[in-house]
C-alpha cells in the first residue's frame, strides 16, 4: 500500500521525480512534476498511456505556466471567457509557446490547463508553487477511481505516495474546451 503524504511530503516526492495520487474534482488523479521528462514518462508508463495524447496541467495560479503559454494569440474576449471560468472544473486547451515541453503537449500545439477550485488540489499546487500533471488514476481504458479505496492496486507500488482527501463530488471529469475556437472537446 502506498504511503499517505502530507502536503510538504508530497512536494518533496514531486521534487524527487515521484508520481503521487490525489483527489480531484471528480476522480482520483495521478500527478508529477511537469518539468521533469523522466517523471512524466514514469507516469505515462504507470497508466500505460500513449505519450502523444498530451496531458492536463492543474495549477492554483496561471502565472506558474506563463513561459509555456502564448496567450497573446487569443482574442481579449476569449481570454476573458477562460479566466472567468476559473477557478473551477473547466480545463482549457490554451495556445502553447515554443518553450512548452513536448512530453506534455504530445502531438498538439496547445497546453491543457485547469485552475482548480478543489481545496486540496489548490493547496497542493500552492505548496508546490508550480503546476502539476493531472490525469486520472487508472490504467488507460479502465474506469477512474472515485474513492481512495478504489485505486487500482497495480498502480500503488509505483507511487511515491498518496495525498488523502475527498474528491470534489462532481459526477463527471472536468470539461475540456479549446480556447481558440471555444469548441467542447470533452463534456
UniProtKB/Swiss-Prot annotation:
One Gene Ontology cellular component term attached to this UniProt record is:
cytoplasm
- InterPro entries referenced in this protein's UniProt entry, alphabetically: DHBP_synth_RibB-like_a/b_dom, Sua5-like_dom, TC-AMP_synthase, TC-AMP_synthase_SUA5
**Source organism (scientific name):** Xylella fastidiosa (strain M12)
Outline the extent of the YrdC-like domain.
4-187
Q: Indicate the family of this protein.
A: Belongs to the SUA5 family. TsaC subfamily.
Indicate the principal place this protein occupies in or around the cell. cytoplasm
Q: What protein name applies here?
A: Threonylcarbamoyl-AMP synthase
Which catalytic reaction applies to this protein?
L-threonine + hydrogencarbonate + ATP = L-threonylcarbamoyladenylate + diphosphate + H2O
Which keywords does this chain's UniProt record carry? Answer: ATP-binding, Cytoplasm, Nucleotide-binding, Nucleotidyltransferase, Transferase, tRNA processing
Amino acid at each position: 500500500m502506498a504511503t499517505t503524504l502530507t502536503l510538504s511530503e508530497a512536494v518533496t516526492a514531486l521534487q524527487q521525480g515521484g508520481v503521487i495520487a490525489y483527489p480531484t474534482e471528480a476522480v482520483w488523479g495521478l500527478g508529477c512534476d511537469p518539468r521533469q521528462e523522466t517523471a512524466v514518462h514514469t507516469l505515462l508508463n504507470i497508466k500505460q498511456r500513449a505519450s502523444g495524447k498530451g496531458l492536463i496541467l492543474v495549477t492554483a495560479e496561471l502565472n506558474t505556466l506563463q513561459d509555456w503559454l502564448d496567450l497573446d494569440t487569443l482574442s481579449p474576449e476569449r481570454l476573458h471567457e477562460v479566466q472567468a471560468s476559473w477557478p473551477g472544473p473547466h480545463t482549457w486547451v490554451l495556445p502553447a509557446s515554443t518553450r512548452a515541453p513536448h512530453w506534455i503537449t504530445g502531438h498538439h500545439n496547445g497546453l491543457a490547463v485547469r485552475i482548480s477550485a478543489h481545496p486540496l488540489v489548490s493547496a497542493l499546487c500552492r505548496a508546490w508553487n508550480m503546476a502539476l500533471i493531472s490525469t486520472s488514476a487508472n490504467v488507460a481504458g479502465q474506469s477512474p477511481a472515485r474513492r481512495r479505496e478504489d485505486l487500482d492496486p497495480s498502480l500503488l507500488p509505483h507511487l511515491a505516495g498518496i495525498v488523502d482527501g475527498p474528491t470534489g463530488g462532481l459526477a463527471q471529469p472536468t470539461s475540456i474546451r479549446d480556447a481558440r475556437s471555444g469548441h467542447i472537446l470533452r463534456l
